[in-house]
């Protein structure tokens, strides 16, 4: 009987060891399967997925399934979320579903809030009409200002009495899904305020400018006159010397701005003599408002002009975009004649009333 009992115990022990071995093998296989799931890139049929406020891991997983990411059981996703400390910590936003992204990397990004970043660029020299048109087509921004006129828009921003022209700094602004056009404009407005204040603090002494607002106006004119950074301080010097002497600025971009949306790409002699608040051929001093969005270099040029004696400048016409600067009207007319000769047009000497 004792032998039989001993054999029975050995049989039970053997069975237990076999079961333990099988369970261990199964555990190893399951773990390897889990690791393969967690660390193998999986393609999706959609480019992105959006986690909305209140979405749980289960809700997010349903969205991933709908986006074509079908690998892995729900239990594996739950285990992985705990392993990467993402359980209950997924951040709201839009996430890219890259073919090279593994589930582990995806959940880590969702925990860290590494959402898709979009970019909107305000181009130097744009006017506010152009800015609004570009902003209206930016996706996936939420659009809330399309029905507002400029005055109502500025009131919405908190600047009810401020003209919008020139008030938004040309830069590239990063945003994400869920942001609005108002969010972008607020940031661009704050950036311009800061850039203008910094430029004004660096202003040269004895400028004929009494406020940062005047510097902004002049910077916008400089911005429209040239795209060459090296020429901006020189052009600023011409305009500032003319202001000091009480001379009219006589610059075409201000006339074009005054013409408005009816401008057809050509500026005619009658345009130079038709008075508008922005016609610097008929009016002395700066324009009532900026005429464009000046960049940082134009802002700095307006308050730190290059030294010199030039009171005039005209296009050289050599394809570089660089102007010729002159200290006297005679020199200026000669430079203008050379420019017109390059264009094979008849030269008309200018008078003291034209730059």
Predicted regions and their residues:
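Generic detector of intrinsically disordered, low-complexity, polar/charged segments
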Residues: 2-5, 11, 24, 51, ...
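N-terminal type II signal-anchor transmembrane helix
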Residues: 2-45
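Intrinsically disordered/low-complexity terminal segments and short unstructured peptides
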Residues: 3, 14, 59, 350-353
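A broad, low-specificity signal for short, low-complexity segments enriched in glycine/proline
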Residues: 8-12, 54-59, 79-83, 92-94, ...
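Compositionally biased amphipathic helical and low-complexity segments enriched in hydrophobic
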Residues: 11-14, 18-19, 62, 330, ...
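Short low-complexity stretches enriched in small and charged residues
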Residues: 15-19, 86-89, 126-129, 236, ...
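Signal peptide-directed extracytoplasmic domains
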Residues: 31-199
């Amino acid at each position: 009987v004792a032998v039989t009992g001993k054999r029975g115990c050995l049989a039970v022990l053997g069975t237990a060891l076999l079961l333990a071995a099988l369970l261990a093998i199964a555990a190893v296989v399951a773990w390897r399967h889990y690791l393969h799931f967690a660390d193998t890139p999986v393609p999706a049929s959609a480019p992105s997925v959006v986690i909305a406020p209140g979405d749980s891991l289960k809700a997010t997983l349903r969205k991933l399934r709908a986006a074509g990411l079908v690998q892995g059981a729900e239990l594996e996703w739950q285990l992985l979320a705990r392993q990467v400390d993402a359980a209950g910590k997924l951040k709201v936003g839009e996430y890219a579903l890259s073919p090279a992204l593994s589930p582990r990397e995806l959940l880590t990004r969702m925990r860290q809030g590494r959402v898709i970043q979009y970019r909107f660029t305000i181009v130097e020299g744009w006017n506010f009409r152009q800015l609004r048109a570009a902003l209206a087509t930016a996706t996936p921004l939420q659009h809330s200002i399309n029905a507002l006129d400029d005055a109502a828009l500025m009131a919405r921003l908190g600047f009810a009495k401020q003209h919008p022209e020139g008030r938004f700094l040309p830069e590239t602004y990063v945003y994400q899904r869920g942001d609005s056009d108002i969010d972008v404009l607020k940031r661009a407005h704050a950036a311009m305020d800061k850039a203008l204040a910094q430029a004004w603090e660096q202003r040269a002494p004895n400028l004929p400018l009494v406020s940062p607002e005047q510097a902004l106006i002049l910077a916008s004119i400089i911005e429209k006159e040239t795209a060459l950074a090296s020429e901006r301080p020189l052009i600023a010097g011409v305009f500032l010397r003319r202001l000091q002497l009480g001379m009219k600025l006589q610059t075409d971009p201000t006339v074009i701005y005054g013409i408005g949306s009816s401008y057809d790409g050509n500026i005619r002699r009658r345009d130079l003599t038709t008075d508008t608040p922005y016609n610097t051929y008929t009016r002395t001093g700066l324009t009532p408002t900026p005429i464009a969005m000046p960049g940082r270099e134009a802002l700095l040029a307006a308050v730190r002009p290059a030294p010199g004696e030039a009171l005039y400048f005209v296009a050289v016409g050599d394809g570089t975009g660089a102007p010729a600067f002159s200290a006297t009207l005679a020199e200026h007319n000669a430079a203008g004649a050379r420019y017109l000769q390059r264009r094979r047009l008849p030269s008309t000497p200018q008078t003291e009333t034209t730059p």
